[in-house]
């Protein structure tokens, strides 16, 4: 009698649950049942209104398997979800996507690296799917935070650490691809997200062994010489892609975190990494946005007007690189303002040098005074060289105006009327 009761109750279960249960073998090592998966896919395509229930039931099973550490069944559930996502593109896919993202989040929250990588791979597949209609309410805040945390993994095992970081970078790249072209997801460009995205990429790019290579366009990225994925190269590729998609209104939020990261990690002296970053920026953005980057570096220089000479020199040298790469005429509409900023810092540097020189005998030793003076000379030479590159990027009709502007702005110390020798500028 009990057996008869069980036989009667079995068919009472909803068909979608029976179809879902059938894809899970008794032994998870046998993997996903392909024939039963085909039946489930056909059912989902034929009855798309059932997709949300299928997703909810799969999510329920996956959560239970994660808690019980039955990771073989977790892998099967995610494989089934991936196939359903690829096969179904109707309006009813949206509730299913919500269940899918909840399951991905469940895996990312796990402390198991294998589950984190599994969840990331599924998210990347989802990110490459073009949905028929945009989502008005979907948010990716959690994924930005979680993938960014994975990018900073400090796992004890180097190989596992690399796997987690690579997965985090791929996840961020998936978020970027899913959101940057969607006007409804413009929130991704807001500071709270860029302040996580950009530093995560730069943190991994700092491990690159070839900074000079990193700055040039068309650099092959993603895999090391042994065929394994390299976090530094992958982060650079993602960084380039993000910058290439940035509109003019988003440039400030994209570049500011770079400047802050360089400040926080003291990367202006020496400035090889800073130069590499801005080469990548200038080669990746649209040419008409170049002057916006130049202006941001100038503004950042203003905030460091009282810092150590070598830090200021490092910023000026980065500015020089951006100007050298910028297209002709891309300095922007406020040309004289740009030159005025540079000349202001040149004058301040000279003032610092003269002040130190006058106090040298009473406050510091001769050797340290000369060292301070030589450091200020480094700043001055960098500024003068940058002014020259700016002049080289100007149209011919503006150069005479700029030369007159410079001559009127920079007097030579010790003479009442003479002006700076401008033969080396422009």
Each language-model region and where it sits:
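N-terminal alpha-helical scaffolding segments that mark the starts
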Residues: 1-55
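HEAT/armadillo-like alpha-solenoid scaffolds in large eukaryotic assembly and transport factors
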Residues: 2-9, 40-51, 66-70, 88-97, ...
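Long, well-ordered core segments of solenoidal/helical folds
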Residues: 104, 200-209, 342-350, 409-411
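Phosphoinositide-driven peripheral membrane association surfaces
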Residues: 59, 102-111, 116, 302, ...
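HEAT-repeat alpha-solenoid elements in large eukaryotic scaffold proteins
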Residues: 25-41, 54-61, 70-85, 114-129, ...
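Charge-rich, solvent-exposed alpha-helical interaction surfaces
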Residues: 15, 19, 57, 146, ...
């Amino acid at each position: 009698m009990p057996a008869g009761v069980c036989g009667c109750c079995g068919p009472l279960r909803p068909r979608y649950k029976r179809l879902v249960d059938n894809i899970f073998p008794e032994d998870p090592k046998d993997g996903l049942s392909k024939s039963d998966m085909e039946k489930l896919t056909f059912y989902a395509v034929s009855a798309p209104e059932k997709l949300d229930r299928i997703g909810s039931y799969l999510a329920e099973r996956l959560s239970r398997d994660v808690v019980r550490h039955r990771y073989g069944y977790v892998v099967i559930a995610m494989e089934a979800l991936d196939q359903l996502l690829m096969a179904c593109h109707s309006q009813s896919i949206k509730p299913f996507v919500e269940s899918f993202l909840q399951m991905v989040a469940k895996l990312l929250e796990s402390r198991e690296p294998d589950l984190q990588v599994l969840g990331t791979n599924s998210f990347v597949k989802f990110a490459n799917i073009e949905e028929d209609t945009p989502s008005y309410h979907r948010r990716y805040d959690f994924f930005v935070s979680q993938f960014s945390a994975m990018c900073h993994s400090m796992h004890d095992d180097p190989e596992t650490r690399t796997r987690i970081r690579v997965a985090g970078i791929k996840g961020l790249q998936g978020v970027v691809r899913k959101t940057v072209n969607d006007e409804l997801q413009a929130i991704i460009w807001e500071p709270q997200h860029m302040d996580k995205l950009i530093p995560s990429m730069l943190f991994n790019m700092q491990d690159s062994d070839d900074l000079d290579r990193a700055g040039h366009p068309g650099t092959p990225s993603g895999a090391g010489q042994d065929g394994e994925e390299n976090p530094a190269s992958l982060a650079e590729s993602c960084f380039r892609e993000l910058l290439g998609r940035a509109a003019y209104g988003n440039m400030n939020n994209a570049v500011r975190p770079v400047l802050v990261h360089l400040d926080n990690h003291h990367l202006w002296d020496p400035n090889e990494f800073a130069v590499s970053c801005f080469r990548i920026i200038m080669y990746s953005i649209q040419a008409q946005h170049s002057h916006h980057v130049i202006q941001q570096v100038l503004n950042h220089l203003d905030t460091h007007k009282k810092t150590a000479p070598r830090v200021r020199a490092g910023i000026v040298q980065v500015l020089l690189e951006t100007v050298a790469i910028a297209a002709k005429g891309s300095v922007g509409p406020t040309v004289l303002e740009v030159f005025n900023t540079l000349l202001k810092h040149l004058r301040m540097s000279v003032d610092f040098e003269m002040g130190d020189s006058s106090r040298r005998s009473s406050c510091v030793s001769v050797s340290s005074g000369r060292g301070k003076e030589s450091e200020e000379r480094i700043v001055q030479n960098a500024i003068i060289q940058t002014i020259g590159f700016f002049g080289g990027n100007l149209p011919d009709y503006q150069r005479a105006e700029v030369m007159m502007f410079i001559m009127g702005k920079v007097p030579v110390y010790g003479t009442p009327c003479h002006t700076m020798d401008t033969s080396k500028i422009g």
